[in-house]
Amino acid sequence: MTNIRKTHPLLKIINSSFVDLPAPSSLSSWWNFGSLLGVCLAVQILTGLFLAMHYTSDTATAFNSVTHICRDVNYGWLLRYLHANGASMFFICLYLHVGRGLYYGSYTYSETWNVGILLLFAVMATAFMGYVLP
């Protein structure tokens, strides 16, 4: 008796793409963090863009604009919390991604590693300028 996921025409496509993926056996859950970084970055950009549509940076009205976002904008509270927690999740994924590279010895690929370190410094500088200084 054969498995339906290997014989059904539609399930066969899904099976070959997701279940029986032609990937090495050493591929572990540590390799997800690069794609999670992309997802977190996309969420940060989108939520930041939508929050910036309603935010005013004037010192007299900044707090009122945040309360306006949370109370009057549809799902504004969700956008604000996604943006705040997405930044933390981004850095958790970033540090785990670097940790995976250290664990598996990716620092031996010096050109790729140096580009990654430059990107890490750029991300940290951007976070400092955008979140710590204001």
UniProtKB/Swiss-Prot annotation:
InterPro entries: Cyt_b/b6_N (IPR005797), Cytb/b6-like_sf (IPR027387), Cytochrome_b_N_euk/bac (IPR048259), Di-haem_cyt_TM (IPR016174). The cytochrome bc1 complex contains 11 subunits: 3 respiratory subunits (MT-CYB, CYC1 and UQCRFS1), 2 core proteins (UQCRC1 and UQCRC2) and 6 low-molecular weight proteins (UQCRH/QCR6, UQCRB/QCR7, UQCRQ/QCR8, UQCR10/QCR9, UQCR11/QCR10 and a cleavage product of UQCRFS1). This cytochrome bc1 complex then forms a dimer. The gene is MT-CYB. Keywords: Electron transport, Heme, Iron, Membrane, Metal-binding, Mitochondrion, Mitochondrion inner membrane, Respiratory chain, Transmembrane, Transmembrane helix, Transport, Ubiquinone. This is Cytochrome b. Binds 2 heme b groups non-covalently. GO terms for cellular component: mitochondrial inner membrane. Heme 1 (or BL or b562) is low-potential and absorbs at about 562 nm, and heme 2 (or BH or b566) is high-potential and absorbs at about 566 nm. The keyword Heme applies. It holds the Pfam family Cytochrome_B. It comes from the Eukaryota. Heme b b566 binds at H97. It is a multi-pass membrane protein. Belongs to the cytochrome b family.
